[in-house]
Amino acid sequence: MRFGFVKVASAIPAVKVADCKFNAQQTEKQIVIADGKGVQIIAFPELNLTGYSCGDLFAQSLLLEQAEFALMQIVNNTRQLDIISIVGMPVMVNSTLMNCAVIFQKGKILGLVPKTYLPNYKEFYEQRWFTPSVAHPDSTTVRLCGQVVPMSARLL
């Protein structure tokens, strides 16, 4: 912190639909660059590890497994950095698919925040694939990348 301020950045890496490995590599590059510039918190777009427009592929367990593996790679490869990172990915919670922000730092996943308001008009069709956070109104824990992680729309 300098003068009481926290340096925050947002990044929009190149993304290939359903190519979690590529998307993870691009995300990791941006995290490393931001950390090198003294950024303390970096946020990425929703579903950046899978791509937003996967459509019915979100129902495929292979995509969900690859997204989790991609997250694990990023978390492990950036464990020596101080930066707090927030990435977007689908996460299965008690047989419901959630569109989540995943927060991590120094090799530890700090929490999951599921999306609350899912659009369902014009080109947006999120309610077809995802469940809003109101389905899990209370804080809970989920297992992600071998870690037990708190999850809540009100996670602080």
Feature map (PLM): residue ranges:
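Enzyme catalytic cores with a strong preference for nitrogen-chemistry domains
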Residues: M1-L156
